[in-house]
Amino acid sequence: MNFDYNKVIPIKGDASFRKFYRKKIKKKSSIIVYAEKEKIKNLLNYDSINQLLLKKNVSAPRLLSENFSQNFIEIEDFGKKTLFDILKTKRNNKFKIYKKILVTLIKLQNIKVKKIKNFKKKFYKIPIYSKSLLLKEVNLFFEWYIPHIFNKKKRFKIDSQLKKVTSSLLKKIKLPNNTFVHRDFHVSNLMLKKKVISVIDSQDAVYGNMAYDLASLIDDVRLRTSKNMKEMIYQEYLYLNKKKINIKKFKNDFEILSVLRNLKIIGIFSRLANRDNKKQYLKLIPYAWELIELRVKDNDIFKDLKKNLEANFPKKIRFKK
């Protein structure tokens, strides 16, 4: 298959290096995923995870054709509306949609396969979401956000203090890395296909903490939800999940992972703005700070983090637009 720019329509991409195009022939359409950079992850691994999801009865894009040497694959088209688009405009019954999302999440978490074959007939082993990888992600906050807020002298002091705090939080995570984690499980990566929730953007999947994807869904920086809605989703997950869960450990990990994830996101959005000139992501940073505040406010485990953030990141910095 050849990729003809004249026969495809560019569509809005995401925060990755990929480009997306819609190909239309008569009444049929498909999506071209183009990736020159990180093509193993963005093409090979992406399709491998999709095939695994499909085998486990989770709706995901099917591979229609591939031309890896030319940096693209062709996949099934799920349309233009994500669950983000639906929830953003929906006034009633939002919780009903979230309940369906949680059913999909639990199906994902029941996946146990760790080695899969890609379309090049080579095996791909799904990595472990180790604490060193989590720490590497949190460091994006230090690498990309802090340098644009503080001068070099102050930055060194803040880096040193805050890195100790985030490292100590990682040591307080209790649950094992034995659960399939999408790693970007939020409503912008979920679509409806014939009333069935479909999962996209799965190339970064790992085996990690069972609280991670729930934290990603509930404390989603792209979509504001009330504190009450967040708690309802959290309790519904506990109700639906038939596994024996240590509630105290789970809550502990949920809140730590949410905070660390949103620090990472602040770093990623700063990188997108300053390196890639995608300034639109900056407007989401104040809400990421709100989500961090929500989790650290009433939990003693964040005592040192709260003290550090209040001393170094006053509201005029956090909520600067």
Spans of features found by a protein language model:
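An alpha-helical support segment within catalytic cores of ATP-dependent transferases
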Residues: 1, 113, 121, 125, ...
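Short secondary-structure junctions
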Residues: 1-6, 54-58, 244-245
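ATP-binding glycine-rich phosphate-binding loop
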Residues: 3-24
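Active-site acidic catalytic loop and adjacent metal/ATP-binding pocket
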Residues: 17-24, 32, 108-109, 166-214, ...
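ATP-binding pocket architecture of kinase catalytic cores
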Residues: 21-136, 174-175
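A glycine-centered beta->alpha junction motif in the catalytic cores
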Residues: 26, 69, 75-90, 123, ...
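Active-site activation/catalytic loop segments of kinase-like enzymes and analogous catalytic loops
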Residues: 139-149, 210-245, 259-276, 288-296
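ATP/Mg2+ or Mg2+-diphosphate-binding catalytic cores
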Residues: 267-321
